[in-house]
Regions:
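Bacterial N-terminal signal peptides that target proteins for export
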Residues: 1-8
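C-terminal motif of bacterial Sec signal peptides marking the signal peptidase cleavage site
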Residues: 16-19
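Bacterial signal peptide processing site
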Residues: 21-23
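N-terminal low-complexity, Pro/Thr/Ser-rich intrinsically disordered segments
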Residues: 25-85
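Non-catalytic, conformational "gating/processing" segments within enzyme and secreted inhibitor domains
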Residues: 37, 42, 46-54, 102, ...
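Post-signal peptide N-terminal segment of secreted/secretory-pathway proteins
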Residues: 72-162
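Internal alpha/beta scaffold segment
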Residues: 303-327
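C-terminal or internal capping secondary-structure element at the end of a domain, subdomain, or sheet
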Residues: 423-432
Length: 432
């Protein structure tokens, strides 16, 4: 548990069910400025391939294949750990601002962390330093190594999937520096594309890339993306996660029961049931128990009666508490199946956390990207998590939109001088 990172965290205040499909793909090579070269990773052993017709696992063969895979991944840098504490501290600083109560919310700290990391490569001066301070990064070199290690350590592609992806979409006629795209590709595995902002063509290209990277889980949100002709840059990070439980729930034991929301209202939901020996953490105001997945684990936190999830998340260091020492217990699970998705506007949250210059056309410094003025117009994140008897599927994307700063100048006010009632006038000579 010491190295656990919060990939996605959420509060289920009331059940919300939703569904969406994936859109048609678009060939993005026609827009490519710089395409990232991903590491050539070996294929992970497929758990099901080592099971016989009765579902019995050949453990010796599977463990041998898994050890071989892990050795090969370590040679490619998989064992070179990022600073997990830095990511947890960032998550602790941001979750309390995002989970304010009243509604279901899903948030990926890692997705925002990586997106802001890319933003530091495109900014300079105090604009950059404010983002670096929020990320807890000592310098640009350390942050680059951190993000690269994070990308590699998160990566999993086999019977369980966990992967990050990054992209920068630039306005096709914008005067931007090639070095910016080169840096993003080298350190962030980010591809850069030029698209005709403000057109359906650009909207489809961006939505297609996002759908491909998130398994189509957020196609409803990506289908609503509308670029603007003033957009200079649209920066994206995605995370996609899919893994089965090591000990699945049995569908035959799933029963309808009552879920009580924070406001006391009741809803019917399908609850999955299972008893297993596992870890439990008894914390101040809550009980936490992780359920193991084929890639990582999902920690469920049940607040004590009278304690809200939001109050726990607002507590300094709460997510770090969840990496503490657990004890063994027989865990009797009763978990609702759920499918929750949300979109969160992060602009005001980031400003409250000290990132202000990037949003100010007079202060923003985007000289590593362009010699013309630019500023961040909006930052948002969409996320979705589904769990059922078999396992967990989750996806998120963070979007940072930057415009030409000149395009953000407010138009002059309109003042009507309709002299249809008594009025004054004064004539001045030309020396006044």
């Amino acid at each position: 548990m010491k190295r656990m990172r919060a990939i996605v965290c959420g509060v289920l205040a009331a059940l919300m069910l939703a569904g969406c499909g994936s859109g048609a793909g678009v060939d993005l090579t026609q827009y490519a400025v710089k395409e990232a070269a991903y590491p050539a990773y070996p294929a992970a052993p497929d758990y099901d391939s080592y099971c016989d017709r009765t579902g019995t696992l050949d453990w010796d063969a599977y463990s041998t294949a898994l050890e071989k895979y892990q050795r090969e991944m370590q040679l490619l840098g998989k064992g070179d750990r990022p600073d997990d504490g830095a990511v947890r501290r960032f998550a602790d600083r941001t979750v309390g601002k995002i989970f304010t109560g009243g509604e279901n919310t899903v948030y990926s700290p890692i997705s925002l962390y990586v997106a802001l990391g890319m933003l530091t490569e495109l900014t300079d001066g105090e604009t950059k330093q404010q983002v670096m301070d929020l990320l807890g990064a000592a310098d640009a070199g350390a942050l680059r190594q951190q993000i690269k290690k994070l990308w590699v350590s998160v990566y999993q592609d086999g019977d369980a999937v966990c992967r990050l992806a990054n992209a920068a979409f630039l306005r096709e006629n914008a005067d931007v520096k090639q070095s910016a795209a080169d840096t993003l590709a080298q350190w962030y595995y980010a591809s850069s594309y030029r698209v005709p902002m403000g057109t359906e063509e650009a909207d489809r290209a961006i939505a297609s890339w996002l759908n491909q990277q998130t398994g189509g889980l957020l196609a409803e949100e990506t289908g609503n993306i509308r670029t603007d002709a003033d957009n200079l840059l649209r920066l994206y990070n995605t995370i996609y996660y899919k893994a089965g439980w090591w000990e699945p729930f049995k569908s035959s034991r799933t029963k309808a029961d009552t879920f009580t929301a924070a406001d006391g209202s009741e809803q019917r939901a399908d609850f999955m049931h299972l008893t297993e020996t596992g870890d439990v953490l008894r914390g101040e105001g809550y009980t936490a128990a992780p359920k193991s997945l084929k890639c990582g684990r999902m920690v469920f936190v049940l607040p004590d009666e009278g304690v809200t999830p939001e109050s726990l998340l607002a507590r300094d260091g709460f997510l770090t508490e969840l990496t503490g020492e657990y004890s063994m217990a027989d865990v009797v699970w009763s978990v609702p199946r759920f499918d929750v998705k949300t979109s969160v506007d992060l602009k005001d949250i980031l400003k409250a956390l000290g990132v202000t210059d990037a949003f100010d056309g007079n202060m923003a410094d985007f000289t590593p990207l362009t010699d013309n003025g630019a500023m961040v117009n909006s930052v948002m994140q969409a996320a979705r998590v589904k769990i059922d008897e078999e396992g967990v599927e989750a996806a998120a994307y963070t979007e940072i939109v930057a415009n030409d700063s000149s395009a953000m100048i407010e138009p002059p006010p309109v003042v009507e001088m309709n002299l249809n009632r008594p009025f004054l006038f004064v004539i001045f000579d030309g020396n006044d």
